[in-house]
């Protein structure tokens, strides 16, 4: 009987866990849908900024100041700034593994070349792993906010601009997961600084630029950095929720399979007990 009680207790426990994983799956699905809408709304904006930044500075009317040139030229013998986006929470499968592995490989490669490295880490999971080996490289760590990401984006943008203006870094790379679907996230390594200058005449023809004041270019640089960080952040968040939804769906299905096996085991145990009792009753009756 004690065995039956243990099986019933375990079935109850697994069912309780299954309810939690199912709820987490639904929450992640809801969050993923909302963020996908935000990404869709921002796609035109990021595309327009990219095109403008890659063309406007090749036009003769736009002359870069010394301060502005720092965003377009590689500063020799300066640090490589690596911005690593991971998750704040777990239960999202292998979501963080690929990014952390890539960052470790790149750090090793840069260190072997004798180059300087600065790390900015977003997300508790990435920070907990990377601080064990690379604490001396970590410049900043930011927690992922549950909502309202604008403040984090502004903080990151200001840190990047300060580092460039003070000649602390030679380039800046963002590591994040790009969303393909709920089951697939693409590891993305995007170089955002120095800003590449090239001219696409087919694009320039669609724009009419008017130079208004000396702050035009610096304002565009601000918009460019904000857009790049915002894009990476949203992609990483929706990828995390997709990975978590998939992981929780798998956990829910596994729990269902385990419940079926435990119920079968429970029924067999009960059947064995009943059969044993019947045999004892029959044996007793025959003895009489």
From Swiss-Prot:
Disulfide bridge map: none
Superkingdom as given in the UniProt entry: Bacteria
Family of the protein in this entry: Belongs to the ATPase gamma chain family.
Quaternary structure (record): F-type ATPases have 2 components, CF(1) - the catalytic core - and CF(0) - the membrane proton channel. CF(1) has five subunits: alpha(3), beta(3), gamma(1), delta(1), epsilon(1). CF(0) has three main subunits: a, b and c.
Membrane topology: Peripheral membrane protein
Subcellular location: Cell inner membrane
GO biological process, any: proton motive force-driven plasma membrane ATP synthesis
Primary location recorded for the protein, binned into one broad class: membrane
InterPro entries: ATP_synth_F1_ATPase_gsu, ATP_synth_F1_gsu, ATP_synth_F1_gsu_CS
Keyword Hydrolase among record annotations: no
A GO term, aspect molecular function: proton-transporting ATP synthase activity, rotational mechanism
Name by which UniProt lists this protein: ATP synthase gamma chain
One Pfam family cited in the UniProt record for this chain: ATP-synt
Keyword terms of this UniProt record: ATP synthesis, Cell inner membrane, Cell membrane, CF(1), Hydrogen ion transport, Ion transport, Membrane, Transport
NCBIfam families listed in its UniProt record: ATPsyn_F1gamma
Cellular component aspect of the GO annotation: plasma membrane; proton-transporting ATP synthase complex
Record's function text: Produces ATP from ADP in the presence of a proton gradient across the membrane. The gamma chain is believed to be important in regulating ATPase activity and the flow of protons through the CF(0) complex.
Source species of the chain: Rickettsia typhi (strain ATCC VR-144 / Wilmington)
């Amino acid at each position: 009987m004690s065995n039956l009680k243990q099986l019933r207790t375990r079935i109850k426990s697994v069912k309780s866990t299954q309810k939690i994983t199912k709820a987490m799956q639904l929450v992640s699905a809801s969050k993923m849908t909302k963020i996908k809408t935000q990404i869709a709304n921002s796609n035109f904006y990021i595309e327009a900024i990219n095109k403008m930044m890659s063309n406007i500075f090749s036009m003769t009317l736009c002359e870069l100041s010394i301060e502005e040139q720092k965003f377009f030229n590689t500063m020799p013998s300066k640090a490589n700034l690596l911005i690593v986006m991971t998750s704040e929470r777990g239960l999202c499968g292998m979501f963080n593994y690929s990014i952390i592995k890539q960052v470790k490989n790149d750090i090793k490669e840069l260190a072997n070349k004798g180059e300087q490295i600065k790390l900015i880490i977003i997300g508790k999971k990435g920070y907990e792993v990377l601080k064990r080996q690379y604490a001396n490289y970590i410049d900043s760590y930011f927690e992922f906010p549950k909502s309202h990401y604008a403040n984090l984006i502004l903080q990151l943008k200001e840190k990047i601009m300060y580092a460039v203006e003070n000649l602390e870094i030679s380039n800046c790379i963002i590591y994040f997961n790009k969303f393909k679907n709920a089951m697939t996230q693409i590891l993305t390594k995007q170089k955002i600084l120095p800003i590449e200058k090239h001219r696409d005449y087919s694009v320039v023809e669609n724009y009419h630029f008017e130079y208004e004041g000396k702050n035009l270019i610096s304002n565009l640089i601000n918009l460019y950095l904000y857009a790049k960080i915002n894009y990476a952040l949203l992609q990483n968040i929706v990828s995390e929720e997709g990975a978590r939804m998939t992981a929780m769906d798998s956990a829910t299905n596994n729990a269902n399979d385990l419940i079926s096996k435990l119920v079968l085991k429970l029924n067999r145990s009960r059947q064995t007990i009943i059969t044993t009792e019947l045999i004892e009753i029959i044996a007793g009756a025959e003895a009489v």
